[in-house]
């Protein structure tokens, strides 16, 4: 419900807020990649691989810092290697309203954030989940799970940039609802009769 009700921001205003040029004629990705506790020693290499593929394909990308889990320093170190790439925008954190609106206008979310599982289906946004984080979680069909592999990453990014494939995957069914749960809850509560039976406890 919060996602649905989040105030919309124009691309022009978003550009000003993050100090990075965005326009409707140019596709951009949002990248958020966290460390997996069981693979924290690989975090640098995994993040470097993701960003290097995006760089080689010259994908305009907004990169957001990871959480503070073990291995986060490796991810941040990898991000710092790309600080001078002109079509990359690196942010340590973003207010929720700006983050949601970046997703609303993005071509794809790439990395392994839970936002790729929960938020993107409602927004009709393709999500590329790289590696084992989030693996086996219940998810909508807009999410593509791939290993941290250069060839597969490049192939999948290319698929997302194909308009025909993009339209096919972006509007898949959303298993998490349409953002109107509060109205449904109110409707159910209104249908419940308030009487003594409701307040009587039964010990089974």
List each model region and its residues.
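Nucleotide-activated sugar donor-binding and catalytic core shared by glycosyltransferases
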Residues: 1-204
């Amino acid at each position: 419900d919060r996602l649905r009700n989040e105030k919309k921001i124009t691309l022009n205003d978003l550009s000003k807020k993050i100090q990075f040029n965005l326009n409707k004629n140019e596709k951009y990705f949002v990248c958020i990649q966290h460390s997996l506790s069981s693979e924290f020693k690989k975090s640098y290499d995994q993040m470097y691989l993701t960003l290097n593929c995006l760089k080689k394909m010259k994908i305009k990308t907004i990169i957001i810092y990871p959480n503070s889990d073990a291995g986060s320093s490796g991810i941040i170190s990898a991000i710092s290697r790309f600080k001078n790439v002109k079509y990359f925008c690196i942010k340590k954190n973003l207010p929720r309203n700006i983050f949601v609106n970046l997703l609303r206008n993005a071509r794809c979310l790439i990395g392994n954030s839970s936002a790729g599982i929960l938020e993107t289906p409602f927004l009709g946004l393709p999500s590329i989940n790289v590696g084992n984080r989030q693996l086996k979680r219940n998810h909508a069909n807009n999410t593509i799970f791939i290993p941290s592999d250069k060839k597969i990453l490049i192939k999948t990014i290319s698929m997302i940039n194909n308009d025909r494939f993009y339209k096919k995957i972006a509007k898949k069914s959303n298993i998490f609802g349409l953002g109107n749960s509060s109205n449904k809850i109110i409707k159910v509560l209104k249908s419940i009769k308030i009487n003594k039976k409701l307040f009587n406890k039964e010990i089974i």
